[in-house]
């Protein structure tokens, strides 16, 4: 999966964001298993980039929730 930029994430609906998080978590799990079994990573920075993207999505979701409460 391609890494998403914040501007791309902001255009997604809440359901799409949840779907992306689930997809990224599956990918992260797959990469973690590959790493723990001693396999060579296809891209060494991929795990941290996936984690960063998940955090980015969660942050934007929380921002949107906070705006909805204040509005």
Curated annotation (Swiss-Prot):
InterPro entries: Ribosomal_protein_uL29 (IPR050063), Ribosomal_uL29 (IPR001854), Ribosomal_uL29_CS (IPR018254), Ribosomal_uL29_sf (IPR036049). PROSITE patterns: RIBOSOMAL_L29. CDD domains: Ribosomal_L29_HIP. Gene3D superfamilies: 1.10.287.310. Keywords: Ribonucleoprotein, Ribosomal protein. It comes from the Archaea. One of its GO terms (cellular component) is cytosolic large ribosomal subunit. One of its GO terms (molecular function) is structural constituent of ribosome. GO terms for biological process: translation. NCBIfam families: L29. Belongs to the universal ribosomal protein uL29 family. This is Large ribosomal subunit protein uL29. It comes from Methanococcus maripaludis (strain C5 / ATCC BAA-1333). The gene is rpl29.
